[in-house]
Amino acid sequence: MKKLDESNPEPRGELQLRILANRTDANISGDISGGWLVTQMDSAASIVANRIARGRTATMAIGDMSFIRPIKVGSVVCCYTHLISMGRSSARIMVEVWSRMPEDELRHKVTEAEFVYVAIDDNRRIRPIEPRISRADSPD
């Protein structure tokens, strides 16, 4: 399992998704479920992938993921994304998750993972991505 990068005290990338974690999103221990969080991360990454591909995409892989801290019910959960690289028909997107309580400005990194998407056509077959990308999508 890869070591989670905690070296940067600020989120990397563009804020793609901000959502309030509710009681219905909690696991039996009372913390927000990891499965719920992965769903939010996939949604955030898909926004970027669909924009880059100018159309439909499919999640091909999710890289290793570990959690630094649990998310409390009532937390504001933010998913930040940045494009790592592009292939002929794929995009690698890093998603960082940060959380904070609504009344607090102090945010904490929760997790990060790399998501790989492929562009697909209407028949769900892999298709090439047009080579042009916007500055907002370009890798660092």
Describe these PLM feature segments:
Residues 2-5, 11-17, 72-73, 84-140:
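HotDog/MaoC-like acyl-thioester-processing domains
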